[in-house]
Design a protein with these regions (language model features):
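Short glycine/serine/threonine-rich phosphate/pyrophosphate-binding segments
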Residues: 43-49
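Periplasmic peptidoglycan-binding/anchoring modules of Gram-negative envelope and division proteins
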Residues: 142
Length: 223
């Protein structure tokens, strides 16, 4: 049991996890805790947060109930409509998505062996996986635009150049590049999205950093 807690938005923790303290004095280093927009794509929600050098307020955040689970459902529906006799569990769908996920110009061959009426059958689900994953693109782009409208004009360009995707959904190959496309086509010419190599552990690393440095009076004591 814990005798104290501190509730912090996951995207802010991700920014802390991405921050490289040893490089803060480098002239060309952009501190992700000062000018960034973090997109955390989880299972149930996609959480986005402006990180501008201070603890984010509710106005700095947006949350959409469209994420990994929604991609799974869409993929399962597409496969079942095309091959209604296939045996397809939720676990199998998730595994197929995680193995073959891609978006945009990133293409993957996805010929898989599934069972129909007790017999093995090889089907090609490449386009279905890609199209299902791409449902996240307009959601993320809309969230980014909504948050940019809340920024000071001086902050828009540096934040737009530092859009960071993390969470399990950011593993979708080609997703960060595809999110840039609708933004740039609508005039956000400086839009730059990226997925850090250690995207899966950023939140955990950030949580440890904060836990080690938080003051005693900042902890929340549960009743």
């Amino acid at each position: 049991l814990f005798d104290r807690v501190l509730v912090i938005p996951e995207p802010f923790l991700a920014a802390m996890g991405l921050r490289e303290e040893a490089r803060l004095s480098d002239s060309g280093y952009v501190d992700p805790t000062r000018h960034s927009l973090i997109v955390d794509i989880g299972a149930g929600t996609t959480d986005m947060c402006l990180v501008q050098g201070y603890y984010p307020t509710p106005d700095d955040q947006v949350c959409y109930p469209v994420a990994g689970d929604a991609v799974d459902k869409t993929l399962a529906d597409r496969i079942r409509r095309r091959w209604p006799d296939l045996v397809l569990s939720r676990v199998t769908v998730t595994q197929l998505k995680e193995r073959y996920s891609c978006a945009g110009s990133a293409r993957r061959e996805a010929k898989v062996r599934l069972f129909a009426d007790g017999k093995p059958r090889v089907i090609d689900i490449a386009d279905m996986v890609r199209e299902s994953c791409e449902m996240l693109v307009p959601v993320i782009a809309d969230g980014i635009k909504a948050l940019l409208k809340r920024c000071d004009s001086d902050s828009v360009v540096p934040i737009l150049q530092n859009v960071i995707l993390c969470g399990g959904g950011s593993a979708i190959q080609g997703l960060s590049e595809m999110v840039q496309q609708p933004l740039r086509s609508e005039g956000y010419e400086d839009a730059t999205c990226r997925t850090p190599p250690d995207y899966r552990r950023l939140v955990a690393v950030g949580a440890v950093k904060i836990a080690e440095n938080v003051r005693d009076d900042q902890w929340q004591i549960p009743m």
